[in-house]
């Protein structure tokens, strides 16, 4: 007969409390007494492993402050939903076996998970695991998985080596094992059994037609992903180099030109645009090369500057540490004198006070020198970087002047062609009626045609001017922001260092007062 305690536990589910959490902390190695004391006192932020097994938990909650947790056991409880785990982003091992979970959810942020057990639950579908790219071990045995093709979902996990699906309805299919082995790559263990390479080959041959089609799709997807990655990388570089919008300028000019669709209805009117486009592409390629070269120079300039700054500060920090170490040694010697030679204690403490004041002066002198040197380095970088920004500004102005000249040339050609076309279709016996309605409207009224051409030209010039203004402003602003942030950093570094020196001084003054008090107490 079940015990009273067990019946009560089944009726009244448990909840996670601080005391329960401490009880469930797992300490690796060490003496039992030491481990027990650590469980009682260690900060939650230092806990790496928790085991809530067999605690009759109905839900997952109250795990805040355990952000460094790497292993969490929640097996053999009454949990129905995976929740409140999103902040445990350092988890590599999670056991939710033997619960009442009906759906996989709430694991999206646990991207470091390597081992996940959902064994013996009520899960009907494999889903919502896409972000767990490091998954190596997955146990979904004894659930309610009934669709064999759902196993295909696991093909995306490149690190998956051990899978357990035993005890699910899908296992009753005569194709179950061959389907899993053919569709999940590089498995080493399936349902507690080591995978035989010969079985994998036989499974792939059995599902050959499907595998060929699948591999073709994956190859196409891989190519698309590669192209997307290259495009994203290129777009990122263009943005970093302040070239965003340059490559698409000519297309954007047309896209935002309300008159362009109407003008394109007039035969041969826009033919000069092809020549303009070719010249634009040539100018743009040359411009991109120049700006990217400047971009690399700016990066190199900043990295070189950072290297000089770090090297100098490391040198000054080493100098300061040496002085502090010497003082700390003197302090230890003085402390021993207070204990061993009370009659000499007072003079030794006075000497130590003198050394402390001298140390303060030395540290302050080092810091003042550092401030002066850093100020010079910041100003030097400001000048060098601003020069590069000004060179870039000239590059932008030169490029957009070329583009404007192209647009003006196109407008002149367009006007000339428009007059020729207008005269052609306004002669007797012209076939103007065969043209689209928009074209007829333009060619029947010279003013309308010229107004449309002018509006188109204005739209193009406006787009050119707008992009130039934006890029030049970005260039100068980013240079100003960087130099300003350097100056802000230098000021904050100085304040922090002065604060460190003062705090160190005050702390040691208190220690000397305590030491003097001990000396007086010893004399009494």
From Swiss-Prot:
Domain of life where this protein originates: Eukaryota
Pfam family, one: LRR_9
Coiled-coil regions listed: 198-247, 313-372, 450-514
GO terms for cellular component: axoneme; cytoplasm; motile cilium
Subcellular location(s) of the protein: Cytoplasm, Cytoskeleton, Flagellum axoneme
Disulfide bonds listed in the record: none
Repeat (LRR) residue spans along the chain: 66-90, 92-110, 111-132, 133-155, 157-183, 250-275, 419-442
Protein function: Component of the nexin-dynein regulatory complex (N-DRC) a key regulator of ciliary/flagellar motility which maintains the alignment and integrity of the distal axoneme and regulates microtubule sliding in motile axonemes. Required for normal flagellar waveform.
Protein name: Dynein regulatory complex subunit 3
Organism annotation: Chlamydomonas reinhardtii
Lineage: Eukaryota, Viridiplantae, Chlorophyta, core chlorophytes, Chlorophyceae
């Amino acid at each position: 007969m079940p015990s009273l305690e067990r019946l009560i536990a089944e009726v009244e589910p448990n909840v996670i409390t601080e005391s329960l959490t401490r009880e469930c902390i797992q300490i690796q190695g060490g003496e039992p007494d030491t481990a027990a004391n650590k469980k009682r006192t260690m900060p939650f932020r230092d806990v790496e492993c928790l085991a809530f097994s067999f605690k009759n938990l109905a839900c997952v909650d109250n795990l805040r402050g355990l952000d460094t947790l790497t292993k969490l056991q929640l097996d053999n409880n009454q949990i129905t939903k995976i929740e409140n785990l999103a902040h445990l982003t350092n988890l590599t091992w999670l056991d939710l076996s033997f619960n009442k979970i009906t759906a996989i959810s709430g694991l999206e942020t646990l991207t470091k998970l390597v081992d996940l057990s959902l064994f013996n639950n009520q899960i009907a579908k494999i889903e919502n695991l896409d972000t767990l790219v490091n998954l190596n071990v997955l146990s979904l045995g004894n659930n309610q998985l009934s669709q064999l093709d759902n196993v295909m979902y696991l093909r995306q996990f490149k690190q998956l080596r051990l899978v357990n699906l035993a005890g699910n309805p899908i296992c009753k299919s005569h194709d179950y094992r061959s389907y899993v082995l053919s569709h999940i790559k590089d498995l080493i263990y399936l349902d507690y059994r080591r995978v035989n390479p010969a079985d994998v080959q036989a499974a792939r041959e059995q599902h050959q037609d499907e595998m060929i089609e699948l591999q073709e799709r994956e190859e196409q997807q891989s190519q698309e992903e590669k192209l997307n990655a290259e495009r994203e990388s290129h777009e990122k570089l263009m943005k970093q180099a302040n070239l965003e919008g340059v490559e698409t300028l000519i297309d954007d000019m047309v896209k935002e030109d309300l008159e362009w669709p109407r003008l394109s209805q007039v035969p041969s009117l826009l033919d000069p645009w092809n020549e303009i486009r070719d010249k634009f592409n040539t100018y743009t390629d040359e411009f991109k090369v120049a700006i990217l070269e400047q971009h690399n120079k700016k990066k190199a300039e900043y990295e070189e500057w950072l290297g000089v700054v770090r090297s100098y500060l490391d040198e000054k920090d080493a100098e300061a540490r040496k002085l502090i170490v010497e003082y700390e040694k003197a302090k230890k010697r003085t402390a021993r004198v207070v204990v061993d030679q009370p009659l000499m204690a007072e003079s030794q403490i006075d000497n130590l006070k003198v050394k402390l004041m001298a140390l303060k002066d030395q540290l302050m002198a080092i810091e003042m020198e550092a401030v002066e040197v850093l100020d010079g380095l910041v100003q030097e970088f400001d000048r060098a970087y601003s020069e590069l920004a000004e060179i870039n500004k000239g590059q932008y102005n030169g490029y957009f002047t070329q583009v404007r000249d192209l647009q003006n040339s196109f407008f002149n050609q367009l006007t000339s062609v428009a007059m020729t076309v207008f005269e052609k279709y306004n002669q007797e016996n012209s076939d103007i009626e065969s043209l689209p309605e928009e074209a007829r409207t333009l060619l029947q009224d010279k003013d309308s045609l010229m107004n449309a051409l002018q509006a188109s030209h204005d739209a193009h010039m406006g787009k050119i001017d707008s992009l130039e203004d934006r890029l030049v402003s970005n260039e100068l602003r980013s240079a100003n922001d960087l130099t300003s942030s350097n100056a802000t950093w230098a000021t904050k570094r100085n304040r922090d260092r002065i604060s460190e020196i003062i705090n160190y001084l005050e702390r040691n003054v208190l220690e000397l007062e305590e030491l003097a008090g001990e000396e007086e107490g010893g004399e009494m």
